[in-house]
Amino acid sequence: MRKLLLAGSILALAVPAHADANGDLVTLVNDVWAASLKEQPVYASALGVNEHASELSDYTLAAQDRRAADAAKFLTRLNAIPSDSLNAASKVEAGILRRALNSTIEGNSFGQRAINFTTYSSWHQQLAGMAQNLPFRTKADFESYNARLAQYARVNDENIAVANVAIKGKYTQPCVTLKGFEGTISGLITTDVNKSRFYEPYAKKRPAGVSEADFAGLAKAAEATIRTVIHPALNKQLAWYTASYKPACATAPGVSAQPGGAKYYAFRVREETTTSLTAEQIHQIGLNEVARIRAEMVEVASQAGYPSREAFIQHLRTDPQYYAKTPEELMEKVARVTKIIDGKMPSLFGRLPRLPYGIKEIPAETAEGTTTAYYNQGSPEIGISGTYFVNTSKLNQRPFWEIPALSVHEGVPGHHHQIALQQELPLSDFRKYGAFFTAFTEGWGLYSERLGIEMGLYDTPAKDMGRLSYEMWRACRLVVDTGIHAKGWSKQQAIDFMTDNSALSAANIEAEVNRYISWPGQALAYKLGELKIRELRTMATKELGPKFNLAAFHDAVLGQGSVPLDVLEQQIKDWVAAEKAKG
Protein backbone atom coordinates (compact mmCIF):
# COMPACT_ATOMS: atom_id res chain seq x y z
CA MET A 1 0.00 0.00 0.00
CA ARG A 2 1.23 3.45 -0.87
CA LYS A 3 1.38 5.92 1.99
CA LEU A 4 0.77 9.63 1.49
CA LEU A 5 3.72 11.84 2.34
CA LEU A 6 2.18 13.31 5.46
CA ALA A 7 -0.70 12.21 7.63
CA GLY A 8 -3.64 14.53 7.97
CA SER A 9 -7.35 14.99 7.51
CA ILE A 10 -8.39 14.58 3.89
CA LEU A 11 -10.32 17.81 3.94
CA ALA A 12 -8.38 19.86 6.45
CA LEU A 13 -9.43 23.13 4.94
CA ALA A 14 -8.87 25.53 7.82
CA VAL A 15 -6.04 28.08 7.41
CA PRO A 16 -3.01 26.97 9.50
CA ALA A 17 -0.71 29.16 11.57
CA HIS A 18 2.65 30.04 10.00
CA ALA A 19 5.37 28.60 12.15
CA ASP A 20 7.13 27.46 8.98
CA ALA A 21 6.02 28.53 5.49
CA ASN A 22 7.74 25.62 3.72
CA GLY A 23 6.22 23.12 6.14
CA ASP A 24 2.80 24.70 5.75
CA LEU A 25 3.09 24.30 1.99
CA VAL A 26 4.01 20.62 2.32
CA THR A 27 0.98 20.06 4.54
CA LEU A 28 -1.28 21.91 2.11
CA VAL A 29 0.03 20.03 -0.92
CA ASN A 30 -0.57 16.70 0.79
CA ASP A 31 -4.07 17.73 1.86
CA VAL A 32 -4.85 18.71 -1.74
CA TRP A 33 -3.50 15.41 -3.02
CA ALA A 34 -5.42 13.36 -0.46
CA ALA A 35 -8.63 15.16 -1.43
CA SER A 36 -7.86 14.47 -5.08
CA LEU A 37 -7.42 10.75 -4.42
CA LYS A 38 -10.72 10.64 -2.56
CA GLU A 39 -12.38 12.08 -5.67
CA GLN A 40 -10.52 9.61 -7.94
CA PRO A 41 -10.74 6.26 -6.12
CA VAL A 42 -9.78 4.09 -9.12
CA TYR A 43 -6.64 6.15 -9.71
CA ALA A 44 -5.93 5.93 -5.97
CA SER A 45 -6.07 2.14 -6.17
CA ALA A 46 -3.71 2.20 -9.14
CA LEU A 47 -1.25 4.05 -6.91
CA GLY A 48 -1.65 1.55 -4.08
CA VAL A 49 -3.83 3.79 -1.88
CA ASN A 50 -6.66 1.54 -0.69
CA GLU A 51 -8.80 3.73 1.55
CA HIS A 52 -11.44 3.95 -1.21
CA ALA A 53 -10.75 0.63 -2.91
CA SER A 54 -14.40 -0.33 -3.53
CA GLU A 55 -15.58 3.07 -4.76
CA LEU A 56 -16.10 4.83 -8.07
CA SER A 57 -16.05 8.58 -8.58
CA ASP A 58 -19.03 10.88 -8.15
CA TYR A 59 -19.82 12.17 -11.66
CA THR A 60 -22.55 14.67 -10.78
CA LEU A 61 -22.41 18.42 -11.33
CA ALA A 62 -22.81 18.77 -7.58
CA ALA A 63 -19.52 16.91 -7.22
CA GLN A 64 -17.89 19.34 -9.65
CA ASP A 65 -19.20 22.21 -7.54
CA ARG A 66 -17.80 20.57 -4.42
CA ARG A 67 -14.37 20.16 -5.99
CA ALA A 68 -14.34 23.79 -7.09
CA ALA A 69 -15.40 24.93 -3.61
CA ASP A 70 -12.65 22.84 -2.03
CA ALA A 71 -10.14 24.28 -4.51
CA ALA A 72 -11.18 27.79 -3.45
CA LYS A 73 -10.62 26.92 0.21
CA PHE A 74 -7.24 25.40 -0.58
CA LEU A 75 -6.37 28.53 -2.55
CA THR A 76 -7.20 30.65 0.50
CA ARG A 77 -4.74 28.56 2.49
CA LEU A 78 -2.11 28.95 -0.21
CA ASN A 79 -2.60 32.73 -0.32
CA ALA A 80 -2.04 32.87 3.43
CA ILE A 81 1.45 31.35 3.10
CA PRO A 82 4.02 34.17 2.68
CA SER A 83 5.75 33.46 -0.63
CA ASP A 84 8.86 35.41 0.34
CA SER A 85 9.43 32.87 3.13
CA LEU A 86 9.49 29.92 0.72
CA ASN A 87 12.68 28.40 -0.63
CA ALA A 88 13.22 28.14 -4.40
CA ALA A 89 11.82 24.61 -4.74
CA SER A 90 8.77 25.47 -2.65
CA LYS A 91 8.08 28.53 -4.81
CA VAL A 92 7.90 26.28 -7.87
CA GLU A 93 5.62 23.86 -5.99
CA ALA A 94 3.38 26.72 -4.88
CA GLY A 95 3.17 28.11 -8.41
CA ILE A 96 2.15 24.76 -9.86
CA LEU A 97 -0.41 24.21 -7.09
CA ARG A 98 -1.85 27.69 -7.64
CA ARG A 99 -2.22 27.00 -11.35
CA ALA A 100 -4.01 23.70 -10.66
CA LEU A 101 -6.42 25.20 -8.13
CA ASN A 102 -7.26 28.18 -10.34
CA SER A 103 -7.85 25.80 -13.24
CA THR A 104 -10.38 23.79 -11.23
CA ILE A 105 -12.20 26.93 -10.13
CA GLU A 106 -12.28 28.62 -13.52
CA GLY A 107 -13.13 25.45 -15.44
CA ASN A 108 -16.20 24.94 -13.28
CA SER A 109 -17.53 28.38 -14.24
CA PHE A 110 -18.28 27.41 -17.85
CA GLY A 111 -21.39 25.68 -19.13
CA GLN A 112 -19.05 23.39 -21.07
CA ARG A 113 -18.35 21.58 -17.79
CA ALA A 114 -21.38 19.47 -18.72
CA ILE A 115 -19.54 18.08 -21.77
CA ASN A 116 -18.66 14.71 -20.25
CA PHE A 117 -17.63 12.59 -23.21
CA THR A 118 -15.85 12.76 -26.53
CA THR A 119 -16.07 10.49 -29.53
CA TYR A 120 -13.20 8.36 -28.22
CA SER A 121 -13.47 8.71 -24.45
CA SER A 122 -16.65 8.21 -22.45
CA TRP A 123 -17.60 6.78 -19.08
CA HIS A 124 -18.45 3.37 -20.54
CA GLN A 125 -15.05 3.14 -22.25
CA GLN A 126 -13.19 4.31 -19.16
CA LEU A 127 -14.89 1.80 -16.88
CA ALA A 128 -14.50 -1.02 -19.41
CA GLY A 129 -10.74 -0.40 -19.28
CA MET A 130 -10.62 0.14 -15.52
CA ALA A 131 -9.16 -3.29 -14.74
CA GLN A 132 -5.94 -2.70 -16.68
CA ASN A 133 -4.83 -0.16 -14.04
CA LEU A 134 -5.80 -2.14 -10.95
CA PRO A 135 -3.98 -4.81 -8.91
CA PHE A 136 -5.41 -8.34 -8.90
CA ARG A 137 -3.35 -10.30 -6.40
CA THR A 138 -5.63 -10.96 -3.44
CA LYS A 139 -9.23 -11.90 -2.72
CA ALA A 140 -9.78 -8.32 -1.52
CA ASP A 141 -8.61 -6.95 -4.89
CA PHE A 142 -11.27 -8.97 -6.73
CA GLU A 143 -13.93 -8.12 -4.15
CA SER A 144 -13.18 -4.42 -4.60
CA TYR A 145 -13.42 -4.78 -8.37
CA ASN A 146 -16.77 -6.55 -8.12
CA ALA A 147 -18.05 -3.84 -5.78
CA ARG A 148 -17.11 -1.28 -8.41
CA LEU A 149 -18.87 -3.22 -11.16
CA ALA A 150 -22.02 -3.18 -9.02
CA GLN A 151 -21.96 0.65 -9.09
CA TYR A 152 -22.04 0.86 -12.87
CA ALA A 153 -25.74 1.74 -13.08
CA ARG A 154 -25.27 4.65 -10.68
CA VAL A 155 -22.33 6.00 -12.68
CA ASN A 156 -24.29 5.60 -15.90
CA ASP A 157 -27.29 7.50 -14.52
CA GLU A 158 -25.09 10.31 -13.18
CA ASN A 159 -23.38 10.79 -16.51
CA ILE A 160 -26.63 10.71 -18.47
CA ALA A 161 -28.02 13.37 -16.11
CA VAL A 162 -24.98 15.60 -16.73
CA ALA A 163 -25.23 15.08 -20.49
CA ASN A 164 -28.92 16.03 -20.32
CA VAL A 165 -27.82 19.36 -18.83
CA ALA A 166 -25.46 19.71 -21.81
CA ILE A 167 -28.38 19.06 -24.17
CA LYS A 168 -30.51 21.69 -22.45
CA GLY A 169 -27.69 24.26 -22.47
CA LYS A 170 -26.68 23.52 -26.10
CA TYR A 171 -23.25 22.18 -25.14
CA THR A 172 -23.48 18.94 -27.10
CA GLN A 173 -20.79 17.38 -29.26
CA PRO A 174 -20.99 18.33 -32.96
CA CYS A 175 -22.92 15.97 -35.22
CA VAL A 176 -19.97 15.60 -37.60
CA THR A 177 -17.91 13.84 -34.91
CA LEU A 178 -20.46 11.27 -33.74
CA LYS A 179 -20.43 8.77 -36.60
CA GLY A 180 -20.16 5.26 -35.17
CA PHE A 181 -20.30 6.34 -31.53
CA GLU A 182 -23.17 3.90 -30.91
CA GLY A 183 -20.78 1.07 -31.68
CA THR A 184 -18.56 1.94 -28.74
CA ILE A 185 -21.56 1.27 -26.48
CA SER A 186 -23.12 -1.74 -28.22
CA GLY A 187 -19.68 -3.30 -28.66
CA LEU A 188 -19.47 -3.78 -24.89
CA ILE A 189 -22.69 -5.83 -24.78
CA THR A 190 -21.50 -9.39 -25.33
CA THR A 191 -23.58 -12.52 -25.76
CA ASP A 192 -20.92 -14.48 -23.90
CA VAL A 193 -20.33 -12.66 -20.61
CA ASN A 194 -16.98 -14.40 -20.25
CA LYS A 195 -15.76 -12.43 -23.29
CA SER A 196 -16.80 -9.08 -21.85
CA ARG A 197 -14.06 -6.52 -21.22
CA PHE A 198 -15.50 -6.14 -17.73
CA TYR A 199 -14.74 -9.83 -17.13
CA GLU A 200 -11.07 -9.60 -18.14
CA PRO A 201 -9.58 -10.03 -14.63
CA TYR A 202 -11.30 -13.42 -14.41
CA ALA A 203 -10.25 -14.49 -17.90
CA LYS A 204 -6.63 -14.44 -16.77
CA LYS A 205 -4.75 -16.98 -14.70
CA ARG A 206 -5.86 -17.18 -11.07
CA PRO A 207 -3.28 -15.48 -8.83
CA ALA A 208 -1.59 -17.63 -6.20
CA GLY A 209 -2.99 -15.47 -3.40
CA VAL A 210 -6.59 -16.42 -4.19
CA SER A 211 -8.01 -19.88 -3.58
CA GLU A 212 -9.66 -21.79 -6.40
CA ALA A 213 -13.01 -21.75 -4.62
CA ASP A 214 -12.87 -18.01 -3.90
CA PHE A 215 -11.83 -17.23 -7.46
CA ALA A 216 -14.68 -19.29 -8.91
CA GLY A 217 -17.21 -17.65 -6.60
CA LEU A 218 -16.00 -14.14 -7.37
CA ALA A 219 -16.01 -14.86 -11.11
CA LYS A 220 -19.59 -16.10 -10.90
CA ALA A 221 -20.60 -12.95 -9.01
CA ALA A 222 -18.93 -10.77 -11.66
CA GLU A 223 -20.77 -12.65 -14.42
CA ALA A 224 -24.08 -11.97 -12.69
CA THR A 225 -23.27 -8.26 -12.27
CA ILE A 226 -22.27 -7.87 -15.90
CA ARG A 227 -25.47 -9.58 -17.02
CA THR A 228 -27.93 -7.92 -14.61
CA VAL A 229 -26.36 -4.49 -13.97
CA ILE A 230 -23.88 -3.50 -16.67
CA HIS A 231 -25.64 -4.80 -19.78
CA PRO A 232 -28.98 -3.19 -18.84
CA ALA A 233 -27.15 0.08 -18.12
CA LEU A 234 -25.41 -0.06 -21.50
CA ASN A 235 -28.73 -0.71 -23.22
CA LYS A 236 -30.20 2.26 -21.35
CA GLN A 237 -27.28 4.45 -22.43
CA LEU A 238 -27.62 3.31 -26.04
CA ALA A 239 -31.36 4.05 -26.09
CA TRP A 240 -30.82 7.46 -24.45
CA TYR A 241 -28.02 8.37 -26.83
CA THR A 242 -30.07 7.40 -29.89
CA ALA A 243 -33.31 9.06 -28.77
CA SER A 244 -32.08 12.13 -26.86
CA TYR A 245 -28.45 13.04 -27.39
CA LYS A 246 -27.79 12.33 -31.05
CA PRO A 247 -30.81 14.35 -32.29
CA ALA A 248 -29.56 17.30 -30.20
CA CYS A 249 -25.99 17.23 -31.53
CA ALA A 250 -24.45 20.58 -32.44
CA THR A 251 -24.54 21.66 -36.08
CA ALA A 252 -21.43 23.87 -35.86
CA PRO A 253 -18.08 22.12 -35.22
CA GLY A 254 -16.45 24.97 -33.29
CA VAL A 255 -16.88 25.45 -29.55
CA SER A 256 -17.08 29.21 -30.13
CA ALA A 257 -20.58 28.67 -31.54
CA GLN A 258 -21.76 27.48 -28.11
CA PRO A 259 -22.97 29.89 -25.41
CA GLY A 260 -19.84 31.48 -23.91
CA GLY A 261 -17.77 29.43 -26.32
CA ALA A 262 -15.20 32.07 -27.30
CA LYS A 263 -14.32 32.73 -23.68
CA TYR A 264 -14.18 29.01 -22.98
CA TYR A 265 -11.83 28.42 -25.92
CA ALA A 266 -9.49 31.15 -24.69
CA PHE A 267 -9.43 29.33 -21.33
CA ARG A 268 -8.68 26.02 -23.03
CA VAL A 269 -5.83 27.56 -25.02
CA ARG A 270 -4.22 28.90 -21.82
CA GLU A 271 -4.77 25.59 -20.05
CA GLU A 272 -3.24 23.38 -22.68
CA THR A 273 -0.34 25.56 -23.81
CA THR A 274 0.58 27.12 -20.43
CA THR A 275 1.29 30.31 -22.42
CA SER A 276 -0.44 33.65 -23.01
CA LEU A 277 -0.47 33.18 -26.79
CA THR A 278 -3.72 34.07 -28.53
CA ALA A 279 -5.51 31.83 -31.01
CA GLU A 280 -4.48 34.18 -33.83
CA GLN A 281 -0.80 34.05 -32.82
CA ILE A 282 -0.91 30.26 -32.61
CA HIS A 283 -2.61 30.04 -36.00
CA GLN A 284 0.24 32.04 -37.56
CA ILE A 285 2.93 29.96 -35.83
CA GLY A 286 1.22 26.92 -37.32
CA LEU A 287 1.21 28.35 -40.83
CA ASN A 288 4.92 29.18 -40.55
CA GLU A 289 5.76 25.67 -39.35
CA VAL A 290 3.66 24.09 -42.10
CA ALA A 291 5.60 26.05 -44.73
CA ARG A 292 8.98 25.06 -43.24
CA ILE A 293 8.16 21.37 -42.92
CA ARG A 294 6.60 21.28 -46.39
CA ALA A 295 9.90 22.47 -47.86
CA GLU A 296 11.76 19.68 -46.03
CA MET A 297 9.26 17.13 -47.37
CA VAL A 298 9.93 18.34 -50.92
CA GLU A 299 13.65 17.77 -50.35
CA VAL A 300 13.14 14.21 -49.04
CA ALA A 301 10.88 13.38 -52.00
CA SER A 302 13.59 14.58 -54.35
CA GLN A 303 16.18 12.41 -52.59
CA ALA A 304 13.84 9.44 -53.08
CA GLY A 305 13.74 10.15 -56.82
CA TYR A 306 10.25 11.58 -57.06
CA PRO A 307 9.39 14.77 -58.97
CA SER A 308 7.23 16.17 -56.19
CA ARG A 309 6.23 15.77 -52.57
CA GLU A 310 2.75 14.73 -53.68
CA ALA A 311 4.06 11.99 -55.96
CA PHE A 312 6.15 10.46 -53.18
CA ILE A 313 3.28 10.66 -50.70
CA GLN A 314 0.97 8.98 -53.23
CA HIS A 315 3.51 6.17 -53.55
CA LEU A 316 3.75 5.81 -49.78
CA ARG A 317 -0.02 5.77 -49.37
CA THR A 318 -0.71 3.17 -52.07
CA ASP A 319 2.23 0.74 -52.35
CA PRO A 320 1.26 -2.56 -50.61
CA GLN A 321 4.85 -3.15 -49.42
CA TYR A 322 4.29 -0.56 -46.69
CA TYR A 323 1.22 -2.19 -45.13
CA ALA A 324 0.63 -5.21 -42.91
CA LYS A 325 -1.70 -7.98 -44.00
CA THR A 326 -2.61 -8.99 -40.44
CA PRO A 327 -2.70 -7.31 -37.02
CA GLU A 328 0.00 -9.73 -35.90
CA GLU A 329 2.35 -8.55 -38.65
CA LEU A 330 1.84 -4.91 -37.66
CA MET A 331 2.45 -5.65 -33.97
CA GLU A 332 5.59 -7.62 -34.87
CA LYS A 333 6.94 -4.62 -36.79
CA VAL A 334 6.23 -2.32 -33.84
CA ALA A 335 7.93 -4.72 -31.41
CA ARG A 336 11.02 -4.91 -33.60
CA VAL A 337 11.35 -1.12 -33.81
CA THR A 338 10.90 -0.63 -30.06
CA LYS A 339 13.69 -3.12 -29.35
CA ILE A 340 16.04 -1.13 -31.58
CA ILE A 341 15.05 2.09 -29.80
CA ASP A 342 15.64 0.55 -26.37
CA GLY A 343 19.25 -0.12 -27.32
CA LYS A 344 19.84 3.52 -28.27
CA MET A 345 18.57 5.05 -25.02
CA PRO A 346 21.78 5.01 -22.90
CA SER A 347 23.54 7.30 -25.37
CA LEU A 348 20.92 10.03 -24.96
CA PHE A 349 20.07 9.86 -21.25
CA GLY A 350 22.00 9.61 -18.04
CA ARG A 351 19.03 8.22 -16.14
CA LEU A 352 16.59 5.56 -17.32
CA PRO A 353 13.37 4.53 -15.52
CA ARG A 354 13.07 1.12 -13.90
CA LEU A 355 9.44 0.48 -14.91
CA PRO A 356 9.15 -1.46 -18.21
CA TYR A 357 6.48 -1.01 -20.85
CA GLY A 358 4.62 -3.37 -23.16
CA ILE A 359 2.73 -3.19 -26.45
CA LYS A 360 -0.95 -4.07 -26.88
CA GLU A 361 -3.64 -3.68 -29.50
CA ILE A 362 -6.30 -1.01 -28.96
CA PRO A 363 -9.60 -2.72 -27.98
CA ALA A 364 -11.67 -3.57 -31.04
CA GLU A 365 -14.82 -1.69 -30.02
CA THR A 366 -12.97 1.64 -29.92
CA ALA A 367 -10.26 1.09 -32.56
CA GLU A 368 -12.36 2.08 -35.58
CA GLY A 369 -12.98 5.60 -34.32
CA THR A 370 -9.83 6.40 -32.42
CA THR A 371 -6.31 7.54 -33.19
CA THR A 372 -3.28 5.56 -34.38
CA ALA A 373 -1.83 4.85 -30.94
CA TYR A 374 -1.74 6.04 -27.35
CA TYR A 375 0.13 5.42 -24.11
CA ASN A 376 -1.32 4.29 -20.79
CA GLN A 377 0.92 4.94 -17.80
CA GLY A 378 1.88 2.13 -15.46
CA SER A 379 2.27 2.05 -11.69
CA PRO A 380 5.51 1.15 -9.89
CA GLU A 381 3.50 0.91 -6.65
CA ILE A 382 1.45 -2.07 -7.78
CA GLY A 383 3.80 -3.43 -10.43
CA ILE A 384 1.83 -2.57 -13.57
CA SER A 385 3.92 -1.77 -16.63
CA GLY A 386 3.23 1.14 -18.95
CA THR A 387 1.43 0.24 -22.16
CA TYR A 388 1.87 1.48 -25.72
CA PHE A 389 -1.45 0.77 -27.45
CA VAL A 390 -1.42 0.32 -31.24
CA ASN A 391 -4.41 0.57 -33.57
CA THR A 392 -4.64 -2.57 -35.72
CA SER A 393 -7.93 -1.72 -37.44
CA LYS A 394 -7.97 -0.49 -41.06
CA LEU A 395 -4.56 -2.04 -41.76
CA ASN A 396 -4.39 -0.48 -45.22
CA GLN A 397 -4.06 2.88 -43.48
CA ARG A 398 -1.40 1.98 -40.87
CA PRO A 399 1.87 2.23 -42.86
CA PHE A 400 5.16 0.78 -41.67
CA TRP A 401 6.96 4.05 -42.37
CA GLU A 402 5.06 5.71 -39.51
CA ILE A 403 6.18 3.16 -36.92
CA PRO A 404 9.58 4.68 -35.91
CA ALA A 405 8.15 8.16 -35.22
CA LEU A 406 5.06 6.71 -33.56
CA SER A 407 7.10 4.44 -31.30
CA VAL A 408 9.57 7.04 -30.03
CA HIS A 409 6.61 9.26 -29.18
CA GLU A 410 4.45 6.75 -27.31
CA GLY A 411 7.13 4.50 -25.83
CA VAL A 412 10.72 5.61 -25.21
CA PRO A 413 12.17 8.17 -25.15
CA GLY A 414 8.69 9.70 -25.30
CA HIS A 415 5.74 9.19 -22.98
CA HIS A 416 6.84 6.05 -21.16
CA HIS A 417 10.33 7.33 -20.45
CA GLN A 418 9.12 10.74 -19.27
CA ILE A 419 6.18 9.55 -17.16
CA ALA A 420 7.88 6.49 -15.65
CA LEU A 421 10.87 8.66 -14.74
CA GLN A 422 8.57 11.24 -13.17
CA GLN A 423 7.10 8.50 -10.97
CA GLU A 424 10.59 7.89 -9.53
CA LEU A 425 11.53 11.52 -8.83
CA PRO A 426 11.82 12.84 -5.25
CA LEU A 427 8.76 15.05 -5.70
CA SER A 428 5.52 15.30 -3.76
CA ASP A 429 2.85 12.80 -4.75
CA PHE A 430 0.86 15.73 -6.12
CA ARG A 431 3.70 16.54 -8.53
CA LYS A 432 4.55 12.94 -9.40
CA TYR A 433 1.05 11.67 -10.03
CA GLY A 434 -1.29 14.65 -10.27
CA ALA A 435 0.49 17.41 -12.19
CA PHE A 436 0.54 16.71 -15.92
CA PHE A 437 0.91 19.67 -18.24
CA THR A 438 0.04 18.73 -21.80
CA ALA A 439 2.45 21.21 -23.36
CA PHE A 440 5.32 19.56 -21.48
CA THR A 441 4.21 15.92 -21.78
CA GLU A 442 3.17 16.06 -25.42
CA GLY A 443 5.87 18.58 -26.31
CA TRP A 444 8.38 16.04 -25.03
CA GLY A 445 6.69 13.30 -27.05
CA LEU A 446 7.06 15.30 -30.26
CA TYR A 447 10.62 16.32 -29.38
CA SER A 448 11.35 12.60 -28.94
CA GLU A 449 10.31 12.01 -32.54
CA ARG A 450 13.09 14.38 -33.54
CA LEU A 451 15.53 12.41 -31.37
CA GLY A 452 14.88 9.53 -33.74
CA ILE A 453 17.17 11.37 -36.18
CA GLU A 454 20.06 11.07 -33.71
CA MET A 455 19.12 7.43 -33.10
CA GLY A 456 19.41 6.69 -36.83
CA LEU A 457 15.82 5.44 -37.03
CA TYR A 458 14.87 7.27 -40.22
CA ASP A 459 17.31 5.43 -42.46
CA THR A 460 15.15 5.46 -45.60
CA PRO A 461 13.37 8.32 -47.36
CA ALA A 462 10.05 6.61 -46.53
CA LYS A 463 10.77 6.62 -42.79
CA ASP A 464 12.06 10.18 -42.93
CA MET A 465 8.90 11.24 -44.71
CA GLY A 466 7.01 9.45 -41.95
CA ARG A 467 8.80 11.59 -39.36
CA LEU A 468 8.14 14.78 -41.32
CA SER A 469 4.53 13.78 -41.83
CA TYR A 470 4.12 13.37 -38.07
CA GLU A 471 5.75 16.74 -37.43
CA MET A 472 3.54 18.27 -40.13
CA TRP A 473 0.54 16.63 -38.44
CA ARG A 474 1.30 18.53 -35.22
CA ALA A 475 1.98 21.78 -37.07
CA CYS A 476 -1.35 21.39 -38.87
CA ARG A 477 -3.02 21.07 -35.49
CA LEU A 478 -2.07 24.65 -34.64
CA VAL A 479 -3.82 25.81 -37.79
CA VAL A 480 -6.79 23.44 -37.70
CA ASP A 481 -7.68 23.66 -33.99
CA THR A 482 -7.66 27.45 -34.02
CA GLY A 483 -9.35 27.43 -37.43
CA ILE A 484 -12.25 25.34 -36.16
CA HIS A 485 -12.71 26.94 -32.75
CA ALA A 486 -11.71 30.57 -33.36
CA LYS A 487 -12.14 31.17 -37.10
CA GLY A 488 -15.30 29.28 -37.94
CA TRP A 489 -13.75 26.57 -40.12
CA SER A 490 -15.91 23.62 -41.18
CA LYS A 491 -14.84 20.02 -40.63
CA GLN A 492 -14.23 19.68 -44.37
CA GLN A 493 -11.92 22.72 -44.38
CA ALA A 494 -9.89 21.09 -41.62
CA ILE A 495 -9.76 17.75 -43.46
CA ASP A 496 -8.73 19.44 -46.71
CA PHE A 497 -5.94 21.39 -45.00
CA MET A 498 -4.52 18.25 -43.39
CA THR A 499 -4.89 16.22 -46.59
CA ASP A 500 -3.07 18.88 -48.61
CA ASN A 501 -0.18 19.18 -46.19
CA SER A 502 0.35 15.88 -44.35
CA ALA A 503 0.96 12.33 -45.53
CA LEU A 504 -1.57 10.93 -43.07
CA SER A 505 -4.15 8.49 -44.35
CA ALA A 506 -7.78 9.51 -44.81
CA ALA A 507 -8.83 7.40 -41.81
CA ASN A 508 -6.26 9.04 -39.55
CA ILE A 509 -7.22 12.52 -40.70
CA GLU A 510 -10.92 11.83 -40.10
CA ALA A 511 -10.27 10.52 -36.58
CA GLU A 512 -7.89 13.36 -35.77
CA VAL A 513 -10.20 16.14 -36.93
CA ASN A 514 -13.01 14.59 -34.89
CA ARG A 515 -10.68 14.69 -31.92
CA TYR A 516 -9.83 18.38 -32.38
CA ILE A 517 -13.51 19.24 -32.66
CA SER A 518 -14.40 17.20 -29.56
CA TRP A 519 -11.49 18.36 -27.39
CA PRO A 520 -10.86 22.08 -28.01
CA GLY A 521 -7.31 23.31 -27.47
CA GLN A 522 -5.65 20.05 -26.45
CA ALA A 523 -3.98 19.54 -29.82
CA LEU A 524 -2.19 22.90 -29.58
CA ALA A 525 0.11 21.70 -26.82
CA TYR A 526 2.26 19.29 -28.86
CA LYS A 527 3.96 21.63 -31.30
CA LEU A 528 4.22 24.58 -28.91
CA GLY A 529 5.82 22.39 -26.26
CA GLU A 530 8.25 20.86 -28.75
CA LEU A 531 9.25 24.28 -30.08
CA LYS A 532 10.01 25.45 -26.54
CA ILE A 533 12.21 22.41 -25.78
CA ARG A 534 14.10 22.87 -29.06
CA GLU A 535 14.52 26.58 -28.31
CA LEU A 536 15.96 25.74 -24.88
CA ARG A 537 18.32 23.14 -26.37
CA THR A 538 19.60 25.73 -28.86
CA MET A 539 20.10 28.25 -26.07
CA ALA A 540 21.92 25.75 -23.84
CA THR A 541 24.15 24.60 -26.72
CA LYS A 542 25.13 28.18 -27.49
CA GLU A 543 25.70 29.14 -23.86
CA LEU A 544 27.72 26.06 -22.89
CA GLY A 545 29.64 25.47 -26.11
CA PRO A 546 31.93 22.43 -25.77
CA LYS A 547 30.64 21.85 -22.22
CA PHE A 548 27.15 21.05 -23.53
CA ASN A 549 26.19 17.42 -22.90
CA LEU A 550 23.02 16.24 -24.60
CA ALA A 551 22.24 13.46 -22.12
CA ALA A 552 22.66 15.89 -19.22
CA PHE A 553 20.38 18.39 -20.97
CA HIS A 554 17.69 15.75 -21.38
CA ASP A 555 17.98 14.74 -17.74
CA ALA A 556 17.65 18.41 -16.77
CA VAL A 557 14.50 18.84 -18.87
CA LEU A 558 12.89 15.80 -17.26
CA GLY A 559 14.37 16.31 -13.81
CA GLN A 560 11.43 18.15 -12.22
CA GLY A 561 8.62 16.21 -13.83
CA SER A 562 5.88 17.78 -15.90
CA VAL A 563 5.94 21.56 -15.50
CA PRO A 564 4.47 24.60 -17.30
CA LEU A 565 6.64 25.92 -20.12
CA ASP A 566 7.63 29.09 -18.29
CA VAL A 567 8.79 26.99 -15.33
CA LEU A 568 10.75 24.73 -17.71
CA GLU A 569 12.49 27.73 -19.24
CA GLN A 570 13.68 28.95 -15.84
CA GLN A 571 14.65 25.41 -14.89
CA ILE A 572 16.97 25.09 -17.91
CA LYS A 573 18.41 28.57 -17.41
CA ASP A 574 19.28 27.56 -13.84
CA TRP A 575 20.86 24.33 -15.11
CA VAL A 576 22.96 26.23 -17.66
CA ALA A 577 24.15 28.61 -14.95
CA ALA A 578 25.07 25.67 -12.71
CA GLU A 579 26.98 23.96 -15.54
CA LYS A 580 28.91 27.16 -16.22
CA ALA A 581 29.77 27.50 -12.55
CA LYS A 582 31.45 24.08 -12.54
CA GLY A 583 34.43 25.72 -14.25
Regions found by a protein language model. Name each.
Residues 19-583:
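N-terminal maturation segment of proteins
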Residues 1-19:
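Gram-negative bacterial Sec-dependent N-terminal signal peptides
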